[in-house]
Each structure stands twice: as structure tokens, then as C-alpha cells.
Amino acid sequence: MSQVLDDLVALLSLEPIEENLFRGRSQDLGFRQLFGGQVLGQSLSAASQTVEDARHVHSLHGYFLRPGDAGLPVVYQVDRVRDGGSFSTRRVTAIQKGQPIFTCSASFQYDEQGFEHQTSMPQIVGPENLPSELELMQQRAHLIPENMRDKMLCPKPIEFRPVTASDPYNPQPTEAVKYIWFRTDGSLPEVPAMHKYLMAYASDFNLLTTSLLPHGKTVWQKDMQVASLDHSLWFHGDLRADDWLLYAMDSPWAGNSRGFSRGSVYNRAGQLVASVSQEGLIRHRKDWA
């Protein structure tokens, strides 16, 4: 396991500070505020620590309420809403400076047999010969703002390999579809829950920007105000975040300064292991035009 991946695993392993209360460290990825994927992964970690191991998370639905401060820790308060015969429900509130910055509900279930079907995995080129996002970024290092360059070019705990690379500094309108392979930069412990925390963390990368593709816009442009508003994630079974996963994303709609994006995550065997949806703010700031 690389040092940056070890740091991420530690980030998602929260400190219990009281019954139903947990504290997590923060990381600065060079964004203007706390990365939403961190809060998603840590919220799931907090909820999972209040549920028996035999019940596995199958869904999480959350709202981003305020920008988080990447320089401060986050406190997670868990409400044990219900433990039923098959399902457990938890409500989690992420708090900074005494204010909620994120809230979500997560549902857990015992494994059981039932009807099964899934959509087929898209026929997409494999990841082996594709350049990573980091390699593509290094090729354009001179275009990255100097105050963000070190953060953008440092080693990453998760390797993303886009199937079709686009130029974030010279975007052109294109179809609102994106395919990206990803996996952690190294092997993970044999702890299924940690693989799901990392899936939640990774699911917030690249999804929102899919809704910008038809408009020839990126998050790097000064005339764009972009932020995640909500996030939903469904787990369809166990997954391995340290083996290649295909993130197939599209955006069927945008309007009223909001973009809606959805994603399907497949393993190399073609199994659908997770589904994602998100609505985000994609506001054109006319004062910069």
C-alpha cells in the first residue's frame, strides 16, 4: 500500500469520541472547500460502526448543506433510526464549527436470496494501455494555476484512467457521456466495509462534471460556480476498490443552474456493483463573463 493510500484509509477510519459520535480528519485536495467524497466516505464509516457486521450497507442518500473547511476536522453524529428484522437505518450529520455541513441516511440489510437481473456492462476498451489522469495532468502542468499545481500533481491514492481524455483547459461541447476506469494505488485490507467507504469517496470524482460536457465548460473556468448539491449511492454487493472498476457516467438533463448526472460501476467480470446519482450546481457567473 502506498503512503497516500495508507493516509486515505486512515482518513476513512474515524475516531469514536462518544456514543454515536465520531471525529474524522480532513484533507486538502486543492479545491476551494472540503471534497464531498471525503464527507461521503466518512459518513458511511460512522454509520457502519453503529450497525452489526452481518448487515451490509446497500444505499446512502445525502445532501450537502454548507461548504466544508478542509483545514478542520469533521464531527459525525449518528442517529440510530431503526433496527428492524432485516434492515437497519441510520441518519448521519456531519458538523463543523457547530453547523451541519452534510446530512445523509444509510440503509443496511442482511444478505438474502431473491430475484436477480442487471444491465450489461458497456463494451469499453480496458484500462491497461490508457494514460492516467495524473499523467495527462502532468502533460499540461504549465496550464495549472500555480497556487494549485503542487496539489494537482502530487501522488494520488486512487488512479483514474479516462477512456476518452478531454482537455480541461480548452473544453469543446461533446456528448454528456463519460467512461473512467479506477482503482486504489495498491492493495487494501480484506475488510469489505473499507472497500465501500473508498467507493463512496471515489464516486464523487468526475460525476458532476459530466453535466458540463455538452456546454463546453469545466470546473476550472472562473466564470463557473460548481458544487455538489446531493448524492445517492446504491451498493449491489461486495466490491474490490483495489481492482479495476469501470465508472460509466451520463447526464440526461440540466436546467435552472443544476445538472443531473448518474453513474453505473462495473467490475472486470461485468458485474454491476454500484449505482450513483447526483445533482449539482452548475451556475454561469455572469459577473465573470
What residue ranges belong to the model's regions?
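Terminal targeting signals and extreme-terminal segments of soluble enzymes
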Residues: 1-289
